[in-house]
């Protein structure tokens, strides 16, 4: 089941012989409280979370789960990617042609692929695919994490199906569209984290669920002045949280 993917008790503080236990911008992903009830994990996770000295999450779904489990409110922070400047680690690219970056899980529908191809052709953009291979769509880039950041920063446009694809787009002030996958039943969805992030920066219009919205969304202007102001305030809040809790170790 998708809700069990990547699960490890150690991620929730189990068997950690630490003086102080804290989380920073953690997330349950698409897992909801009712999933934990169905899987029989609520009692165990409640016990784990009550042992934390400080709890921080990155989305309201996770915040709600922690509160349902423990009765306690957690801090609410942006993804850690926003909190660090990676510039000195990012290589300079020798890629000369303007490109459309597709940062997505494998298996984009043929309808989305066709729309993306037409958009790229209309704007004379090369299509470069990152993260997941897209059969018949552009060039797949098998690169290092810091090379990826350089490519995201230099992209003309970004299309993504992921939370972190949207994070990179915001961090580097890109014109982008985020394809949302609404969860059905106990299957996978990306709207818990993705929708929460875009709502926070008032960019819900960049989230689409139909191929015909790609062109309009990629061409829409984004006021990054207000977005960056909000992100900078949240980053400061996150750093203050970290500093305050690190002091407790002294």
State where each predicted segment sits.
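Active-site anion-handling motifs in enzyme catalytic cores
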Residues: 1-250
């Amino acid at each position: 089941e998708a809700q069990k993917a990547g699960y490890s008790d150690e991620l929730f503080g189990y068997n950690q012989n630490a003086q102080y236990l804290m989380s920073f911008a953690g997330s349950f992903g698409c897992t909801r409280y009712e999933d934990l009830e169905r899987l029989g994990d609520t009692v165990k996770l409640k016990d784990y979370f009550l042992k934390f000295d400080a709890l921080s999450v990155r989305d309201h779904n996770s915040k709600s789960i922690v509160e349902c489990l423990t009765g306690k409110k957690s801090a609410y922070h942006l993804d850690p990617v926003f909190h660090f400047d990676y510039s000195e680690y990012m290589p300079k690219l020798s890629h000369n042609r303007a490109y459309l970056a597709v940062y997505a899980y494998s298996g984009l529908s043929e309808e989305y692929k066709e729309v993306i191809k037409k958009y790229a052709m209309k704007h004379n953009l090369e299509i470069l695919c990152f993260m997941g291979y897209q059969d018949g769509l552009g060039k797949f880039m098998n690169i290092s994490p810091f090379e990826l950041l350089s490519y995201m920063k230099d992209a003309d446009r970004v299309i993504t199906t992921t939370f972190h694809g949207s994070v990179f787009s915001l961090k580097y002030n890109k014109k982008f569209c985020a394809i949302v996958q609404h969860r059905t039943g106990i299957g996978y969805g990306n709207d818990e984290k993705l929708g929460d992030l875009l709502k926070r920066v008032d960019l819900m219009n960049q989230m689409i669920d139909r191929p015909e919205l790609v062109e309009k969304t990629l061409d829409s202007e984004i006021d990054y002045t207000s977005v960056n102001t909000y992100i900078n305030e949240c980053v400061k809040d996150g750093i203050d949280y970290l500093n305050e809790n690190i002091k407790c170790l002294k």
